[in-house]
Amino acid sequence: MEDVQGRADTRQIEINKVGIKDIRHPVRVRDRTGRDQHTVATFSMYVNLPQHFKGTHMSRFVSILEGHDREVTVESFHEMLAEMTDRLEAHSGHIEMAFPYFVNKQAPVTGVESLMDYEVTFIGEIHGGRHETWVRVAVPITTLCPCSKEIAERGAHNQRSLVVVTALMDGFVWLEELIDLVEREGSCELYGLLKRPDEKHVTERAYDNPKFVEDVVRDIAGRLNDDGRIAAYSVTSENYESIHNHSAFALIEQDKRGR
């Protein structure tokens, strides 16, 4: 049978990324306790397509996923990137692997345990044989408005905020380390389960530690700047304002490699 996508294309336009998007597959991720978490990730896999090819081989992307013992690990994620560009005869490739990641947390006063889930994404890129691996963590926190605290006679408005850190690694970093870093720079961190003494503690903790959205990203950026294992990063914070029908947002980007 004729391979239609293998035909020549006469438009002379290269495609930057072509492939499959949002395919789910089992993955295994080792956490800081040394245990493996079995979860399901959503993959997006792309390669470049030279101008003289009509189409790419879409089935090969799925075949690469299926070839990893039906369960992808962090180690095989890096192998997949090289395999993908090799099998599809491309000089650049891009893989994203997004999955829920769970951390067991203790409430601050009673010590009651519960799970917190975080959205994690591994982003791998290869271009001309050069690899880069980025890790993205989305961490919810509580923020309390310094202005509201200053002007109000009783209380202050607070809200849940979402911080997203995307970091280029130049050394090994546990996911929990990035999560801990973010949570320490909020007005207060979140928990899956709180008893009344815990709720009192987190309410007072947030009140004693007010932060604007600008404070959050600057404090996190300062911590990332001090970590030699992180070569570049972006950090965003979105505050889901409790007294407005809009969000507050801030972004800092930094390439510590001097580019």
UniProtKB/Swiss-Prot annotation:
Protein's GO biological process: tetrahydrofolate biosynthetic process
Keywords assigned by UniProt, alphabetized: Hydrolase
Enzymatic reactions: GTP + H2O = 7,8-dihydroneopterin 3'-triphosphate + formate + H(+)
Chain segments annotated as transmembrane: none
Residues under site feature: May be catalytically important: 145
Pathway: Cofactor biosynthesis; 7,8-dihydroneopterin triphosphate biosynthesis; 7,8-dihydroneopterin triphosphate from GTP: step 1/1
Enzyme Commission code: 3.5.4.16
GO terms for MF: GTP cyclohydrolase I activity
EC category: hydrolase
Family, similarity comment: Belongs to the GTP cyclohydrolase IV family.
PANTHER family membership: GTP CYCLOHYDROLASE MPTA (PTHR36445:SF1)
Role description: Converts GTP to 7,8-dihydroneopterin triphosphate.
Protein name per Swiss-Prot or TrEMBL: GTP cyclohydrolase FolE2
Organism name: Halorhodospira halophila (strain DSM 244 / SL1) (Ectothiorhodospira halophila (strain DSM 244 / SL1))
Lineage: Bacteria, Pseudomonadati, Pseudomonadota, Gammaproteobacteria, Chromatiales
